């Protein structure tokens, strides 16, 4: 399975590890994915892998 949020499409980013001696090596920053059950607009529930930031946004929108 790809490490991609199924709602926003947020995926891995590329960056550097930086040591105290300022040596740089490539690394990947992975999104914080969570598997949750999401209730869709038509009333059905579906298991989705979404980013934690997306989950916070959904909770905020549903509370209004």
Curated annotation (Swiss-Prot):
InterPro entries linked:
Bacterial_rp_bL28, Ribosomal_bL28, Ribosomal_bL28/bL31-like_sf, Ribosomal_bL28_bact-type, Ribosomal_bL28_sf
The entry's keywords = Ribonucleoprotein, Ribosomal protein
Q: Listed GO cellular component terms?
A: ribonucleoprotein complex; ribosome
* Coiled-coil residue spans: none
Claim: Ribonucleoprotein is one of the keywords in the record: yes
Q: Which GO biological process categories is it annotated with?
A: translation
Q: Which family does it belong to?
A: Belongs to the bacterial ribosomal protein bL28 family.
| Official protein name in the record | Large ribosomal subunit protein bL28
Q: Which organism is it from?
A: Campylobacter jejuni subsp. doylei (strain ATCC BAA-1458 / RM4099 / 269.97)
Write the gene name. Answer: rpmB
């Amino acid at each position: 399975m790809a490490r991609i949020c199924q709602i926003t499409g947020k995926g891995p980013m590329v960056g550097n590890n930086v040591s105290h001696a300022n040596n740089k090596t490539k690394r990947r920053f992975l999104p914080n994915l969570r598997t949750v059950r999401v209730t869709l607009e038509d009333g059905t529930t579906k298991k989705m892998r979404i980013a934690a930031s997306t989950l916070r946004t959904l909770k905020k929108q549903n509370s209004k």
